[in-house]
Amino acid sequence: MMYAFAAIAWLGFVVHNVADLPGQTLISSETLWPTAVTAVLLLLYAFGPRRAATIGILAWAALHFMGGIVSVLPLPFLPFEPDQTLRHYSFHVLYALTQVPLVAVSWQEVRRPTTRA
């Protein structure tokens, strides 16, 4: 489930960036670097210290979830480009909602008791 939900979360992020932000592509730094972080966390989850990777995935997904919400608030330190329209807000709703399954599954895994050999 972790991989499927990570793919959904990543897709929501990419759709937000490429479809809603002016001039963004899959290789724009605003998309490429977060994609690399996601890939590294999933590689660590698959082959490295799983608990630490799960905590990292949880933090990363929570950051994306909060970013999807906070970045549309009218805070003076945030740039408002593109314009804050219903279309833009709908992309943020999509972006935030696609993070929820990954937050939930990683939270459940972090809370699962660890077994000692």
Region roles according to the model:
Residues M1-A117:
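Polytopic alpha-helical membrane-helix bundles and their juxtamembrane interface segments
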